[in-house]
Design a protein with these regions (language model features):
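Junction motif at the cytosolic side of a transmembrane helix
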Residues: 161, 165, 223-243
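Residue-level recognition of pore/gate-forming positions within transmembrane alpha-helices
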Residues: 1, 82, 177-181, 226
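Hydrophobic core positions of alpha-helical segments in small-molecule transporters
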Residues: 76-77, 172-176, 221
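Central hydrophobic cores of alpha-helical transmembrane segments
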Residues: 169-183, 201
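Helix-loop-helix units of permease transmembrane domains in multi-pass membrane transporters
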Residues: 52-85
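Secretory targeting signals
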Residues: 2-51, 80-156, 160, 201-222
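Short loop-to-helix capping motifs
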Residues: 1, 68-71, 167-169
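Transmembrane helix-loop junctions in multipass membrane proteins, especially transporters and channels
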Residues: 8-12, 98-110, 168, 188-196, ...
């Protein structure tokens, strides 16, 4: 609501060079409220279900599953549900914001020549598939909502894997938030120029807030997050095997 009130409503007229596609929260990088939302995405993604494995161990349900030899089915179903919950929690605020922008701001295609499209060049790397951004802007938004869904789900998966090592629900919730902060800080030190290209959350934006976007980097980061989750869950399952 603050984003709509402060960063959308005052600039809703077409004379300001904005349309839905350039001012919604996923595509506009000049807002502190959007920055705060993306900062909290790892925490929000973990809250719905990432602590389920820990809760099931504490209640004894996980031990019951083990005695029934249903461990693989348990983890398969848990990961899918946790991934879906984390992804939905990530894109739900973005979808609501997009809908509100459609109610207030003109539905006009971005114009590379006439409008200030906030550093989205046709041949640059501020976003993936820039030609789609100009020719089919709504499709471009839907594509990045899908990417944001995947990023949120994968981060929730990492938190789920960490719940096999942690004994406190709150620590499970904040674990990925802390790890993501430390990771971004480390990458920022190692790669002083273009560090944001290697941040997973960069690809939850339609337009990169800093640096550039690379499709190969995004795919690699997603594979790494999935790999970390699988290794962590296997390690945790081994650690909590019944004697």
């Amino acid at each position: 609501m603050l984003y709509i009130a402060k960063d959308v409503y005052p600039y809703r007229a077409l004379k300001y060079g904005h349309s839905v596609y350039t001012i919604w929260m996923g595509g506009f990088n000049g807002s502190i409220y959007a920055s705060l939302f993306y900062l909290l995405v790892p925490l929000l993604a973990a809250i719905p279900m990432a602590d389920t494995w820990l809760s099931d161990r504490q209640s004894g349900y996980y031990q019951f599953v083990q005695t029934r030899n249903k461990t693989k089915q348990y983890f398969r179903g848990l990961y899918v549900c946790n991934f879906t919950a984390g992804g939905l929690v990530t894109i739900f605020p973005l979808a609501i914001n997009l809908y509100a922008c459609f109610l207030l701001v003109p539905d006009e295609k971005p114009d590379l020549i006439l409008w200030d499209t906030h550093t989205v060049s046709l041949y640059g790397k501020e976003t993936l598939f820039p030609s789609v951004f100009y020719d089919y802007p709504l499709l471009h938004i839907c594509l990045f909502l899908f990417f944001a869904f995947c990023i949120g789900g994968l981060l929730a998966g990492v938190a789920l894997a960490l719940s096999g090592l942690l004994k406190n629900i709150f620590m499970v919730w904040v674990s990925v938030f802390v790890l993501n902060y430390l990771y971004e800080s480390l990458v920022g030190i190692v790669c002083k120029n273009g560090a944001a290209t290697y941040y997973p959350l960069t690809y939850a934006h339609q337009v990169a807030p800093l640096g550039e976007m690379e499709l190969s980097v995004m795919v690699t980061l997603m594979i790494l997050l999935l790999g970390i989750t699988i290794i962590g869950m296997c390690w945790g399952a081994k650690r909590h095997e019944l004697d």
